Amino acid sequence: ARIPLSSLNPEIERITAGKPHLYVLNKSDLADPEITRQWLAYFKSAGAGCIAMDSKQRGRATATKGLIEKELSALMERRRSRGMVGAAIRVMIVGIPNVGKSTFINSFAGTTRAKAANKPGVTRGKQWISVDSFDLMDMPGVLWKKFDSLETASNLAFIGSIRDDILDIEELACGLLSSVRGIYPQQLLARYKLDAEALTLPPYDLLQAIGAKRGMLISGGEVDTERAAKMLVGEFRASKWGRLSLERPPRRAIQEDREEVTDDAPQDDDWDDEQ
């Protein structure tokens, strides 16, 4: 829910073009509620099914069952007309790493059915999980080969969808400070007990100031910036700064993007045979 646009995988959009979609803004408990409402309105105005939730709340994902059936109403009607009553509805749960897909499935099922953890790469292979009249496919998180912008790559790294061990943690922390101080300055000031002038510092100097405030010093009184960076990124991901959203809805409608993708993609006129 904190980066709805950056987390939208264009390859998945291309592959699934023409098929029913339901966008789940998961981990909404970490996002700015007002911005999340704007995103819901944005998707709704484009005619796209969308729901915001915190899948850690047991049973919360069951609210999506009715929405899934709504998105698949045409398919279900075709099945009924062909006498295919009682056939399971197949749903693919797909998204980038570390957005709570397995947690969503466990909430949907009302019990632990998929292994989940707050880090990328926990789900290693696809598996089918049956829940009532639904067959859910749990899949590993998928990133695409080339990001369209540095902002997209940075946002994915900020929330932990890219493994930290391949990143420069200090550079990541400085990028996060640059992004957040312009949209949520008061949260930074309050969390790290800074004065307003600190926000005018270059990002690395601001990181040092935060490390000094937390007493993260090494011999000679210098700030341990690596330790400070790990702390800062970890606290952001754990929502210790408050409920923050890094993206606002863009002006162009999502429907325009999906229509462009659909024009280039092969159509599946008999989707119900597979789904």
Q: What are the functions of these language-model segments?
A:
Residues 1-21, 28, 34, 48-49, ...:
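Helix-rich effector regions associated with P-loop NTPase G domains
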